[in-house]
Amino acid sequence: MNENLFTSFITPMILGLPLVTLIVLFPSLLFPTSNRLVSNRFVTLQQWMLQLVSKQMMSIHNSKGQTWTLMLMSLILFIGSTNLLGLLPHSFTPTTQLSMNLGMAIPLWAGAVITGFRNKTKASLAHFLPQGTPTPLIPMLVIIETISLFIQPMALAVRLTANITAGHLLIHLIGGATLALMSISTTTALITFTILILLTILEFAVAMIQAYVFTLLVSLYLHDNT
Amino acid sequence: MASVVPLKEKKLLEVKLGELPSWILMRDFTPSGIAGAFQRGYYRYYNKYVNVKKGSIAGLSMVLAAYVFLNYCRSYKELKHERLRKYH
């Protein structure tokens, strides 16, 4: 059971070739584009959903912040589809790998911070000191704010990794427990029910993306536009 | 009877069994040829099941079912040990 539990998280390779590239690229197949005004049901549904999400997310930004719309919409689509595909049996979820999430979090956060520093230097530096702090506390507070700034990309990446990995592990564990208890019965019904509930809650992995992009968004908003 | 249609232009189902090796060897295996094959396959599936007036969930589910199956094949080696047996 020990070795078995974590084998679903190793990078899939086939004869030494990286199969993980294909798995990462697979969700792009599920989002076809269409340049017609009235397209098929699939594309129409996706366009409607995308419009809903983009309106809800980008409305708080000014015109400069809204140039990030394409980036953020692709981000939410990618993370959402990858997490949902990972809920299928036997599939591999790329977002369980911390390397990948760091690769997404650090450049985006750095872009937002550097944009803020280049265009509104004074306002960005002013973020390090909340209004109305007593004078003796200022040095300590600046240090604390700097630490909290630099921990943002780490928090973004680790949050996503930990949530998805923990959910998958729990499903494996509880599923295994159910199978083991099948021969002993009585508690089986209860455990199976718990699995069902857990899976439903895990489908709020979609809410995970919401959390990811939203947090990123807040950071972008604060730094860029104030 | 010699074939009146040249081998190159025949579809796979029209090729006789004896001509099969030469037909396979004649296919375009350059990178652009392979890319073209994938593109043709993709559009064949897309136009048949998704890009229709009343597309149903079947178009998407078949893709996901194939994805699950391929992942099962990929991890069969580790799953072999989980079969129902008396002694593990």
Swiss-Prot record, chain B:
PTM sites of type N-acetylalanine: A2
- Give the primary localization class: mitochondrion
Topology term for the membrane: Single-pass membrane protein
Keyword Transmembrane, does the record have it? yes
One Pfam entry for this protein is: WRW
Write the record's keywords in alphabetical order, separated by commas.
Acetylation, ATP synthesis, CF(0), Hydrogen ion transport, Ion transport, Membrane, Mitochondrion, Mitochondrion inner membrane, Phosphoprotein, Transmembrane, Transmembrane helix, Transport
Where is this chain's protein located in or outside the cell? Mitochondrion; Mitochondrion inner membrane
Q: Name one GO cellular component term.
A: proton-transporting ATP synthase complex
What is the role of the protein in this entry?
Subunit f, of the mitochondrial membrane ATP synthase complex (F(1)F(0) ATP synthase or Complex V) that produces ATP from ADP in the presence of a proton gradient across the membrane which is generated by electron transport complexes of the respiratory chain. ATP synthase complex consist of a soluble F(1) head domain - the catalytic core - and a membrane F(1) domain - the membrane proton channel. These two domains are linked by a central stalk rotating inside the F(1) region and a stationary peripheral stalk.
Similarity field: Belongs to the ATPase F chain family.
Assembly, in brief, is: Component of the ATP synthase complex composed at least of ATP5F1A/subunit alpha, ATP5F1B/subunit beta, ATP5MC1/subunit c (homooctomer), MT-ATP6/subunit a, MT-ATP8/subunit 8, ATP5ME/subunit e, ATP5MF/subunit f, ATP5MG/subunit g, ATP5MK/subunit k, ATP5MJ/subunit j, ATP5F1C/subunit gamma, ATP5F1D/subunit delta, ATP5F1E/subunit epsilon, ATP5PF/subunit F6, ATP5PB/subunit b, ATP5PD/subunit d, ATP5PO/subunit OSCP.
Q: What is this protein called?
A: ATP synthase F(0) complex subunit f, mitochondrial
Say which species the protein is native to: Bos taurus (Bovine)
Q: What is the lineage of its organism?
A: Eukaryota, Metazoa, Chordata, Craniata, Vertebrata
Gene encoding the protein: ATP5MF
